[in-house]
Amino acid sequence: MCLHWGLCNLARIAKLGDIRGGYNYVKLACSLLDKLESRECASEVICISTQVVSYVEPLQATLEYYDKGCAAAMASGDIFQASFNMFLGHTSHFFAGMKLQTTREKGEEVIKFMNARNVLIFNIPVQHMQNMVLHLIGLDEEPKDVSAGEENISENMKTSYYFQKLYISFIFRMFDDTKAYAEKFLAWNVSNTWVNLWVSYSFYTFYIGLVSFWVARNSRDEEQWYERGNKSKLALRKWAETSQWTFENKWFLLEAEEAFCNGNFDDAKVYYEKAVTSAKTHKFVHEEALACELAAYFYLEIGEANKAVDYCLLAHEKYQEWGAIGKCTSLFKYFEG
């Protein structure tokens, strides 16, 4: 810890497993920042510390920190840090389950800001996130840099590129594409430890877990995918210890999917309901919708059609509340089929 600048690099202790310890260092760093009036690095301290704070405080409550970080960067003339805060803020805005139209508008503002200042390093991953938003809303348009072929994607953009492909394939139930992009995402991120430093890593872990249990139920290399799903589940369970608000519902949903895989249907029923209730309590409407949808597939599989329909209708209602009209259409087509 640098007492002169109030820098919070020691908050990285949280990434070694001591999240509470890292959180305490973050609070100390931010208090030093205020006390010493360190304007030059304020935006960086806020941006980096928010990555740790997000593992303790409700995710929705952390969104304002990125706005503060951006304002601090602009006050000191640091366009790079302003863009960095905007990029990470937009990502958290999506994962926090804010209304999709609002997230879309926020993304457009971020892209416009970066284009005007030629900040390309964060522009493209923001466009990848926008592509997910547009698909969910039900629009055919794509941000201009998203349509580029995989071979044209630079190395440092592959994490966001593969994840948006994986996410869209999973949400719209395209099994083969989901499996293929999950394999590419996992292969790339084995050697890309930098991505593990950001709170978005926890959401990557969550979706990889869901994908893994789905693939495990439907492929010959079941054991490998089951192990991946279990690894994700254990990670979410650990994070739920420091932030029940943000991670409990995700952990419960992975427990449900694992129980489904193992044929423990009674346990699966309990955990699906827990996942739905927790997501509702903690105001993650998009994950409440997802938990209902996956519960519907489960009940359909075990022959309880009426229960499946109930969960499908609730999933549709919650996706609509989120603004995911494209997903609503896809969901009804799937169950009609």
Q: What residue spans do the PLM features occupy?
A:
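Conserved, mostly hydrophobic/aromatic
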Residues: 77
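Active-site/ligand-binding-proximal alpha/beta "capping" segment
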Residues: 60-69, 73
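Leucine-rich, hydrophobic repeat-scaffold detector
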Residues: 16, 24, 42-47, 257-263, ...
